[in-house]
Structures are given as structure tokens and as C-alpha cells.
């Protein structure tokens, strides 16, 4: 079993609807630990760079607009198989397909405002964590 780090973003809809504490409970109950956390307002440039992988997709502009529409909470999670474990507790990207008992299944209604982001691979987790945090902040 590998101890991994992964990035979590509690999106503007989660912050606005004051469900960040509930989401953190799901994270902690899964056995993952939050080792770094920061509340911030992403600039358009930051959102474009972070989601650059989606720049040619039709939803890119809407995604950037949404992610800059309010505060987000970026977190680094650590634990056994953190990337896959967090993806499991997030639930399917489309909340309509997400199981009950997952973050999206319990708290989200719309695919474009689905409450959370999580790294989709260990490689992307390293890149995404470095985007927001210096190594010395991860304690």
C-alpha cells in the first residue's frame, strides 16, 4: 500500500453553500488527512493555467469562469492510495451518476457545479500540488 498525496479543491459552490466542513468530514472519515489547506480566490490566469489540459474542450471557458466566481479551498490530502481513495469518495463527475454516500452524490446537483476537484493520477497530483503549495508547506 502506497502512501500518496493528492490535491483537493473545494469549488466556489461548496464554499458559497457552506458545506466545506461536511466535505472535510467525508475526507477524514475515509482515512485521508488534510496536511495543507488554503482559502483563495483564483485569478483568471491561474484558473486557465491550472485547467490548461482542458483548453480545447468546449466547457473550458465556463469552467474558468466558474472557478473564478468565488473563493475556493485548496487542500493537500495524504494517505494510503490517496488519489484513488479521494476519487472514490468524490463520486462520479456527473452528480446524477454519483452514488449516495459520496460527496457529489450527497451534495451536488449539476455537472458544472459539482463541489470538488481531485487529482486524477499520481503524476497530476504532483503537478497540481506544486501549482498551489511549496514543498516546505506540506507538513
Swiss-Prot record:
Against SMART domains, the record matches this protein to: NDK
User: Has keyword Kinase?
Assistant: yes
Which cofactor does this sequence's record say it needs? Mg(2+)
Q: EC number(s) for this protein?
A: 2.7.4.6
CDD domains hit by this protein: NDPk_I
Top-level taxon = Bacteria
Looking at the UniProt record for this protein, which Gene Ontology cellular component terms does it annotate, in alphabetical order? cytoplasm
Positions binding ATP in this chain are: 11, 59, 87, 93, 104, 114
Please give the Gene3D superfamilies that the UniProt record associates with this protein.
Answer: Nucleoside diphosphate kinase-like domain
Instruction: Enumerate the subcellular locations listed in this protein's record, separating them with semicolons.
Output: Cytoplasm
Tell whether Transit peptide is among the UniProt keywords: no
Biological process, per Gene Ontology: CTP biosynthetic process; GTP biosynthetic process; UTP biosynthetic process
Share what the entry says about its subunit structure, partners included. Answer: Homotetramer.
According to its UniProt entry, what is the function of this protein?
Major role in the synthesis of nucleoside triphosphates other than ATP. The ATP gamma phosphate is transferred to the NDP beta phosphate via a ping-pong mechanism, using a phosphorylated active-site intermediate.
* Record family assignment: Belongs to the NDK family.
The protein's name is: Nucleoside diphosphate kinase
